[in-house]
Amino acid sequence: MRLGIYGGTFDPIHIGHLRMAVEVQEKFSLDKVVLIPCNTPPHKENGAAASARDRLAMVRMAVEGRAGLEASDMEISQGGPSYTVATLEALQSPDKELFFILGLDAFLEIHTWKEYERLFSLAHFIVLARPWQGDRAEMFHVEQYIRENLPGLAVPEPDQGYFRALHENKRIYFAQTTALDISATHIRKTVNQGKSIAFLAPESVEKYIKRQGLYL
């Protein structure tokens, strides 16, 4: 099984998250993309605005009825800070090929993550390129970053359009998805101002936010 792993705070989940997941699933022929809300984000000083329970509920609502997308509570049920290395380790299985999905900005800080060297032996990476730049431009940017911060972990394969990790034959791919200028921060501010978030988040999520009084 080709399994996409998409972690995040999802505070709240929105149409941008979902559209990206669908496009990555199709582009890389993934059997499934699992969206995993973190319990406590280790790289965010103020934590999440909504509780883990609420964020998980919203992710479950957002993917309900959508073939190929699934919500998981594995990081929330584990408790404590959510570390990607532990998540990918727990998902290892002979019948699974893991693809870890993350944005370029997150990738360019990966040398600050816990046991970051091990990540490249646990899963392929799918790095989401910025919408205003092409894959080739991003590859050049990432090549510089790897050379300076991750020496010995990956080498470029420019003719193939990816980097090859030097452990377990994993690869670092690049993908561009439809540019949707939507952010969870903007949604929280919009809710706080008493304005509508219709068509920014799934209707079920919008109703849940109102019902629970989130982000006020």
From Swiss-Prot:
Keyword NAD in record: yes
The protein's annotated pathway: Cofactor biosynthesis; NAD(+) biosynthesis; deamido-NAD(+) from nicotinate D-ribonucleotide: step 1/1
SS bond partners: none
Reactions mediated catalytically: nicotinate beta-D-ribonucleotide + ATP + H(+) = deamido-NAD(+) + diphosphate
GO MF entry, a single one: nicotinate-nucleotide adenylyltransferase activity
The keyword Membrane appears for this protein: no
GO terms under biological process: NAD biosynthetic process
Keywords, sorted A to Z: ATP-binding, NAD, Nucleotide-binding, Nucleotidyltransferase, Pyridine nucleotide biosynthesis, Transferase
SUPFAM superfamilies membership: Nucleotidylyl transferase
Signal sequence coordinates: none
EC number of this enzyme: 2.7.7.18
Family under the similarity heading: Belongs to the NadD family.
PANTHER family membership: NICOTINATE-NUCLEOTIDE ADENYLYLTRANSFERASE-RELATED, PHOSPHOPANTETHEINE ADENYLYLTRANSFERASE
Function text: Catalyzes the reversible adenylation of nicotinate mononucleotide (NaMN) to nicotinic acid adenine dinucleotide (NaAD).
Name recorded for this polypeptide: Probable nicotinate-nucleotide adenylyltransferase
Organism per entry: Desulfatibacillum aliphaticivorans
